[in-house]
């Protein structure tokens, strides 16, 4: 497989996680996952920015993206069952990684929306890859490409969301 082809399939593989991670900006709101509870340090466990609607909406959107991908490239997945499971795990893993990042940011007393370089851009990716590993994985070279490429996509998407008025800060 050539380098460009390898990069394309790496992006195709991770696409459900990208969509899942971006969707809560548009679908979120409502009841916070932590229910307003505080950790023993006195800070919120996750904060108002992590809601059930955003989490479940993100997992749903990411899973749907995987189903659509299956119909476009069935050979990539082998079966619809594998596509649904992989897309669900990538999406769920991405948002679990985002929740862990939010938890860590609250422990560091970082306010909601405050940037944490590396944690914001890669936490969701690493968690998505880990959750999906038992079903289907990609090469180490493809993983390295995603580790380099994802922060660029993340920063660009956040800036776009800011310019569209969907986010209050450009990071």
UniProtKB/Swiss-Prot annotation:
Pfam families: CarS-like. GO terms for biological process: glycerophospholipid biosynthetic process. It is found in: Cell membrane. GO terms for molecular function: CDP-2,3-bis-(O-geranylgeranyl)-sn-glycerol synthase activity. It comes from the Archaea. It is a multi-pass membrane protein. NCBIfam families: PRK04032.1. Catalyzes the formation of CDP-2,3-bis-(O-geranylgeranyl)-sn-glycerol (CDP-archaeol) from 2,3-bis-(O-geranylgeranyl)-sn-glycerol 1-phosphate (DGGGP) and CTP. This reaction is the third ether-bond-formation step in the biosynthesis of archaeal membrane lipids. This is CDP-archaeol synthase. It comes from Thermococcus gammatolerans (strain DSM 15229 / JCM 11827 / EJ3).
